[in-house]
Amino acid sequence: MVCLSFFFLTIPLIISVKGVSLEKIKPIIDSNHIHFGENKVQEALEKWSKIKEENKNINLHLIGKLQTNKVKYCLPLFDYIHSLDSIKLADKIANEQVKKNFKPKIFLQINIGDEQQKSGIDFKDAENLYTKIKNDFDLNIIGLMCIPPNVSNTKPFFEKMNQISKILNLNELSMGMSNDYLDAAKNSATFVRIGSKIFGER
């Protein structure tokens, strides 16, 4: 697995490949890295449909916002969805996974900084919404995801995510990117999402 030298802990690394050509991705696949993240469903369909047929061990993660009208294109392409943020979306995924006979692993996206411009569940409503989704839909929810505010110190937000995950008894935490992955790792991140540190700014 590539790029784990960034870390003092062994944490699965999702390489964010939004806008990255297959020419640049192929050597990473050839090095046996398996976790890749895409932000947009359409781009992922164009890039990964054939590659995943040829490389069955690859795990593709949707790390961007998922619109309800795109759910039908997500499965079975994406093994992980990191952006469940509403009852309506939960219903769409639940129906589609029955049609496709494929059950992705799912993260609830938490709006940990209470930012109006960002997607995600209000962290104050996380417990109630998670309970309702868990009771109403047969989804494989494994953890929480967040994108903290763009501030110099993101540590308090990761600490809060860690607390929420313990309250909900969810073991997986998808948090930390190129500029703050160390603080995320110190607060129990189980997946980090790195792009610009590998490919440069896009």
How should these model regions be labeled?
Residues 198-200:
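Expand to "…catalyze enediolate/carbanion chemistry for C-C bond making/breaking, isomerization
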Residues 1-172, 177-179, 185-187:
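Conserved alpha/beta-domain cores
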